[in-house]
């Protein structure tokens, strides 16, 4: 299907290009009056000075949409011209020109839609959208859903470096807008693109990712981060030791680490009190894997709190959705019904497989029993 974009005038391609050239020259562009051929060379020359129409949003959109409608039909140098369009739209973005950012994004949105969904040049266009939106605080004006973006990257068949470029720009845009939850997910996706061979290049990104997850009160399970190649490169660093404690340690492990690394904890902006709250919930989750009940006194000792604080702590732990438990106030015990897995490795997969097989066998047994007492239905 042919791509249709808004046009400056309704005319043949070369005539449209001549009209755009004339208009830009009238706006002060350093252009000759005579058009040149072939069309791709004409468009390249026009794009060199198209910024003269960026003063007014209406002119910017009209002229750039018309140029792009021609770019998409040229037989040669199409990708080169699209890149030049993107470069022009993201250039000259001084603070006092941010009012035109919305218009630039609208032009890019039209271009993005005008390209086939599997066209690799959509990558260039989307990166330009992210750059402009981040600079002008207009991130809400463009699509940023991680699953959608990952789907696009699969369609465009881009390489690892191009994927990283998108994830890095997307993370920066979301981070600047204080959308930290989404930004963290994007950073994890970015780190997952690295291999053993190049993981060391993402060392600082890995540190940033770990700190970001540790600072979030609602993020408690982090074994997925520990398995990322760039995070593994951090082994031996205090940040890696701290992450290991949050993945599989307990309150006492954290307290020992804090006593030896207080300055480090403070330097990366972590709250000691928040860390303790998270570690207490994580410790209870580990306890719940070993036993289904524990006395107030024993639990208080393991968590480093008083027995009087157990009730309030349990309420907060249950609110995380990772623990199901109740108080037995008569016998001063905590009864633990279930807890989430802190880590999910090969042992957990094998256990899940065994449980599913047992469930399947039970269902087959029930079906066999029913078939033995209920006559088959004939039609």
Swiss-Prot record:
Keywords: Cytoplasm, Initiation factor, Protein biosynthesis. Component of the eukaryotic translation initiation factor 3 (eIF-3) complex, which is involved in protein synthesis of a specialized repertoire of mRNAs and, together with other initiation factors, stimulates binding of mRNA and methionyl-tRNAi to the 40S ribosome. The eIF-3 complex specifically targets and initiates translation of a subset of mRNAs involved in cell proliferation. Belongs to the eIF-3 subunit M family. Its main location: cytoplasm. One of its GO terms (molecular function) is translation initiation factor activity. One of its GO terms (cellular component) is eukaryotic translation initiation factor 3 complex. This is Eukaryotic translation initiation factor 3 subunit M. Residues 179-341 form the PCI domain. InterPro entries: ARM-type_fold, COPS7/eIF3m, eIF3m, eIF3m_C_helix, PCI_dom, WH_DNA-bd_sf. The keyword Protein transport does not apply. HAMAP family: eIF3m. GO terms for biological process: cytoplasmic translational initiation; formation of cytoplasmic translation initiation complex. It is found in: Cytoplasm. Component of the eukaryotic translation initiation factor 3 (eIF-3) complex. Disulfide bonds: none annotated.
């Amino acid at each position: 299907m042919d791509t249709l974009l808004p046009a400056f005038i309704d005319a043949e391609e070369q005539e449209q290009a001549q009209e755009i050239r004339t208009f830009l020259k009238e706006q002060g562009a350093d252009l000759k009056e005579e058009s040149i051929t072939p069309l791709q060379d004409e468009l390249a020359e026009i794009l060199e000075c198209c910024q003269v129409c960026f003063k007014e949003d209406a002119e910017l959109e009209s002229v750039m949409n018309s140029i792009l409608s021609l770019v998409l039909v040229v037989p040669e140098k199409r990708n080169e011209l699209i890149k030049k369009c993107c470069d022009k739209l993201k250039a000259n973005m001084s603070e006092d020109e941010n009012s035109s950012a919305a218009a630039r994004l609208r032009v890019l949105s039209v271009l993005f839609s005008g390209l086939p969904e599997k066209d690799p040049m959509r990558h260039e266009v989307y990166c330009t959208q992210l750059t402009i939106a981040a600079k002008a605080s207009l991130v809400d004006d463009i699509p940023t859903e991680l699953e959608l973006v990952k789907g696009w990257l699969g369609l465009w068949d881009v390489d690892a470096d191009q994927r990283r470029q998108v994830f890095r720009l997307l993370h920066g845009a979301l981070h600047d807008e204080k959308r930290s939850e989404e930004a963290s997910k994007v950073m994890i996706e970015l780190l997952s693109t690295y291999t053993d061979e190049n993981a060391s290049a993402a060392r600082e990104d890995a540190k940033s990712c770990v700190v970001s997850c540790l600072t979030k009160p609602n993020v408690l399970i982090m074994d997925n981060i520990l398995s990322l190649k760039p995070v593994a490169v951090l082994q031996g660093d205090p940040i890696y030791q701290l992450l290991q404690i949050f993945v599989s340690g307990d309150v006492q492990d954290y307290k020992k680490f804090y006593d030896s690394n207080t300055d480090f904890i403070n330097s990366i902006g972590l709250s000691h009190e928040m860390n303790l709250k998270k570690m207490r919930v994580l410790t209870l989750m580990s306890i719940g894997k070993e036993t289904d009940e524990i006395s107030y006194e024993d639990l208080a000792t393991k968590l480093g709190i008083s027995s009087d604080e157990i009730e309030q702590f349990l309420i907060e732990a249950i609110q995380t959705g990772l623990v199901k438990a109740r108080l037995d106030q008569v016998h001063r015990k905590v009864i633990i019904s279930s807890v989430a897995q802190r880590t999910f490795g090969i042992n957990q997969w094998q256990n899940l497989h065994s449980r599913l097989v047992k469930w399947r066998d039970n269902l087959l047994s029930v079906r066999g029993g029913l078939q033995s007492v209920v006559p088959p239905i004939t039609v």
